[in-house]
Structures are given as C-alpha cells and as structure tokens.
C-alpha cells in the first residue's frame, strides 16, 4: 500500500482494509464503538479492516487499474 501526502493509494482490498483501520485509529475510535455506531458486529468490522470484502471488490479494483485509474482514500476537508 502506498501512502503519499497523507493519502492511501488503494490497489488491493487489503489496502482498503488497512486504510479503514488507519483512519479509524487516527480518529481514536475502537472497533467496538465503530461497529456499534454502524449497526454491524465487531467481528464483521474486523474482517473489513483485514481486507476481506469479497471477490466483487477485488475485481472492481483490478478493472480500475486495468483502465488506468486509481482509488485514493484521504481525509475529508473540514466542514465550515
């Protein structure tokens, strides 16, 4: 996973999971609290952070790279 200018370049589902974990941790939120706020179980959130999304996401990421695109995860701009 490449990090540039505070952004995560997502090449694989595992990269996306790592970015989820990174930004959740930076926000000071536990898996349990995040899962509860989202209405999902903590084990499911853990699997997402481990990059286990299913084959459709993997194929979508591969197609995006094939056609010359990239997926980047970055913090939102502050609202104000």
PLM region descriptions:
Residues 29-44:
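Short alpha-helical DNA-recognition segment
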Residues 18, 28-29, 55:
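Residue-level signal for the short linker/turn that defines the boundary of a DNA-recognition helix
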Residues 58-74:
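DNA major-groove recognition helix of helix-turn-helix/homeodomain DNA-binding modules
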Residues 46-47, 51, 62:
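Alpha-helical DNA-recognition elements
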Residues 25, 39, 50-52:
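Residue-level detection of the helix-turn-helix DNA-binding "recognition helix"
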Residues 1-15, 50, 70, 75-80:
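N-terminal flexible/basic segments that precede or flank functional cores
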Residues 13-25:
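N-terminal first-folded block
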Residues 42-47, 58:
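Base-recognition residues in the alpha-helical recognition helix of bacterial helix-turn-helix
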């Amino acid at each position: 996973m490449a990090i540039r200018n505070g952004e995560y370049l997502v090449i694989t589902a595992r990269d996306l999971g790592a970015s989820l974990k990174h930004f959740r941790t930076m926000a000071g939120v536990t898996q349990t609290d995040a899962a509860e706020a989202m209405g999902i179980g903590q084990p499911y959130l853990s699997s997402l952070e481990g990059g286990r999304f299913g084959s459709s996401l993997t194929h979508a990421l591969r197609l995006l790279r094939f056609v010359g695109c990239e997926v980047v995860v970055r913090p939102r701009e502050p609202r104000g």
